[in-house]
Structure formats: C-alpha cells, structure tokens
Amino acid sequence: MKLFDVYPLFDLNFIKAEGSYLWNDKNEKYLDLYGGHAVISIGHSHPTYVQKVTEQLQHIGFYSNSVKIPIQEEVAEKLGKISGYEDYSLFMCNSGAEANENAIKLASFHAKKKKNICFTKAFHGRTAAAVAATDNKSIIAPTNESDNFIFVPFNNTTALEEAFKNHEISSVIIEGIQGVGGVQIPEVSFLEKIRSLCDEHEAVFICDEIQSGYGRTGKFFAHQHAQVQADIITIAKGMGNGFPVGGVLIAPKFQAKHGLLGTTFGGNYLACAASIAVLETIEKENLLQNATDLGNYLYEELKNDPLIQEIRYQGLMFGIELKVSCAPLRNKLLSEFNILTGNASCPKTLRILPALNITKIELDAFIDAFKILSKSNL
C-alpha cells in the first residue's frame, strides 16, 4: 500500500523538535515560524506538555464517553476561567472540522432553521457542513454542495443585512480572524452587527477560533478584541499543541440531551492531559502578553520594508502581503536560512504563526533574513 497523494510536500524529514526549532534527519536545525498551521502553541516538546501526556499514558490513555472521565471536567473548568466563558459548556471532539460540524448542527437544532451565513475567503474545514461553509469550490464535492450556505462578502454590513432579510437564518459562522484567507481581520462594527442581527432574528452566532484562538492574538479569543460574545465558539489546533483535540464552547441557552452530539475519541485522557498542559503553560508563562509584545515588535521591524504592501496582524498571527508573489521569498527563507513559514489563499501573503513563547532573538533571525532577501530582489 502507498499513501494517497494529496499533500504537496517539502523534501524534509524532521526527527526532533524543541521550542521553536526542528531538526531533520541530517541534524540540520530549522526555525519554525508556522507551527504546522498554528498548532504548536507552547513550543515543540514543552516540558510540561511532555510530562503531563507521559504521566497520563502510564495510567490510562483511552476509554469511551460511556464512563466518567473527570479530567474532561478539569479541562472545562480551566478553559472557562482563562477564556472568560465560565458559564458556557464544553463539548470535546478531535479536530477543527469536527468542531465546526457539531457547531453548525447544534445551531440548527436550536434555531430549528436550515440556512447559514458564511463569508468570502472563509475556511472552516473539509468535511460535509464545514466544507460547504468554506469559500473554495475546488474542495467541495458534488455531495457537499448545499443551498443552505449563503456566502456574504467579508466585512460587508449591507450584504449581511440583505442575507438576513431574504432568508430564515439558523447561524452565522465567521472566523475570529480568517487564516487561510490571508489573515483578514473582521471589523469591530461588523462583528457587532453580526451579534445584533443574530439577536434580532434568533439566529446563532458561531465564532470559529480554531486558528485565531488560544492566545494567538493577545486575547484568548480573537473576537474578544471587539468585546462581543459568540453563542458557540469552536477550537482546535493550538488547544493540544500537536495532540489531536478540538472543542465546542456552548452558551447556557442551549439545551443538552443524551445523544444530541457524540464522539468516540473526543475528550480522551491523553487529549485532556495535552489540553491542560497548554492552558497551564499559557497562564504560567504569560503567553498572551508575549504574543502582544512580540507581535508589535515584529510589525515595527518590518512595517517600512519596501517589499511589503501591507501587514495584517493581531498578536502573533501575521499576514505579510508582499508586492509580488510570496513563493520565491518563502522558498529562499527555507532553502537559504532554514526558516519555515506559511502561505495563504492569496498568493502574495506570507503567514507567520509561531509558538506563543517565541523569543525576540528567534524573531530577529527571521527579520534579518527577510531584510536580506528583500534587498536582494530575490
């Protein structure tokens, strides 16, 4: 058997990782400024993470959600306190797509309606409802096509109001910051309008914080910069620092009943141990403040570079839009400086999503490399 060839791969084989660094099978060291799509939130092989997952594995790694798993309650309590959503409930699952599937489903159960508003450049996952809410026709199979998902131009209040006027809306799903779309930040007034329209029309406000959450922007959730509250919040990626885990934060107005949602692996002991390690480290190392401070530092160092058209960022979530395609720069950062970065659906946008505990010295290595390549005209 061979692997199903769906991933374009760099010719790299990493065998060790620590903090913001990776080593390949030739013992060459790489600086990781992408974290596998914002997954590595507290750094590779963080001691607290390794210890908690190892200790848990030595006791019990898995049983299904047919028995009490008290460590799930510990995750919910810690997450509620650090996020400011203490009165919400947590449903644990395995990935971002699964979190969004359950969010859209739960919203429809609650609202008793079918139509969902989503936005241009959105990415919510590759499974049934999640991919139907994603603005990329190339990954939507015929069986996933649905007229229950209405695409509205991002940050366009007039179009949003029209969609509510013309349809019975079950939910609005929006990313706290669009990641794949190129780090597009929703305007405060736009999020406020979503909140007010959802209240007026008894629709559910779903905020997808899978990439933008868990302290990446300097707030625990990106939408908290706008001081609005979502009814449902979806999480994954940085939640487990590499261990597959996702979750749905659910407002008190939603009524739970047995069988309404379900998962085999979600909330297993190891996933919970990983999640607790991340939350404890974010709090202990004050990583929200580090994300704010170093994000501002990176912006100040790069904002006047002549190669750059625009920098869109909050905290350590960066979309650096160049005046040309970012592919040559990204390739040379990797081949000449051993620095891993990301791209986006817009070909000119370089994405930077480092661990939240990255240091100024580590960022300086990227800044120096960027400026050298910028001056060289690539």
Describe the predicted segments one by one.
Residues 1-378:
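Conserved N-terminal phosphate-binding loop of PLP-dependent enzymes in the Aspartate aminotransferase
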